[in-house]
């Protein structure tokens, strides 16, 4: 009788250990599978598919997502140009020029106090902005097939109380016309730099 009770306890204990190990392994498998799926989804979101592999990619434009393709440029409605949205702001954070631009945050507190008397180097800011944006444009898959440099126009507004710079970038390439209308194509993006 004593032997049979301890045998039952031994069998129950053994089954309990097997179930515990199975549960742990199952949990690890599910967590690993979910993390792998999330990583693949993130990498698909971050790394835009190779645009040059899409048939007729030039007619589609820089963005393959319909919601991005249908964005209208808010600052020109003359109809002379075809504006296509090129989301370069996702590439901007990788550039070292951002650190040099953000160094203006050191000046911002003094600009708040003496903004009427302080003259900072606008040419320096503009040249850094241009270099930074051109590097980001060249990282975008769509714009990598252009051989020449983009003709870039940058407009910015420094909002000192809010400690931010609003940037409007418009760029174009020579002999880049819309196939349907024959009008010159201009690409654009707008973004905000926080100086905090």
From Swiss-Prot:
Transmembrane segments: 11-31
Keyword Transmembrane: yes
One Pfam family recorded for the sequence: DUF5452
Cellular localisation: Membrane
Topology in the lipid bilayer: Single-pass membrane protein
Source species, domain of life: Bacteria
GO cellular component: membrane
Keyword tags: Membrane, Transmembrane, Transmembrane helix
Major site of localization recorded for this protein: membrane
Protein's name in the database: Uncharacterized protein MG286
């Amino acid at each position: 009788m004593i032997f049979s009770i301890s045998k039952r306890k031994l069998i129950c204990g053994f089954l309990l250990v097997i179930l515990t190990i199975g549960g742990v392994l199952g949990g690890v498998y599910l967590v690993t599978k979910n993390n792998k799926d999330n990583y693949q989804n993130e990498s698909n979101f971050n790394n835009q598919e190779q645009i040059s592999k899409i048939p007729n990619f030039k007619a589609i434009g820089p963005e393959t997502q319909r919601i991005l393709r249908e964005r209208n440029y808010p600052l020109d409605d003359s109809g002379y140009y075809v504006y296509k949205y090129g989301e370069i702001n996702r590439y901007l954070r990788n550039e070292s020029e951002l650190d040099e631009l953000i160094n203006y945050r050191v000046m911002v507190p003094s600009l708040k106090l003496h903004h009427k008397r302080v003259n900072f180097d606008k040419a320096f800011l503009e040249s850094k902005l241009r270099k930074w944006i051109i590097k980001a444009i060249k990282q975008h898959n769509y714009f990598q097939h252009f051989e020449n440099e983009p003709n870039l126009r940058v407009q910015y507004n420094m909002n000192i109380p809010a400690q931010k710079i609003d940037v409007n970038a418009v760029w174009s390439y020579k002999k880049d016309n819309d196939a349907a209308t024959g009008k010159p194509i201009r690409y654009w993006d707008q973004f905000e730099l926080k100086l905090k």
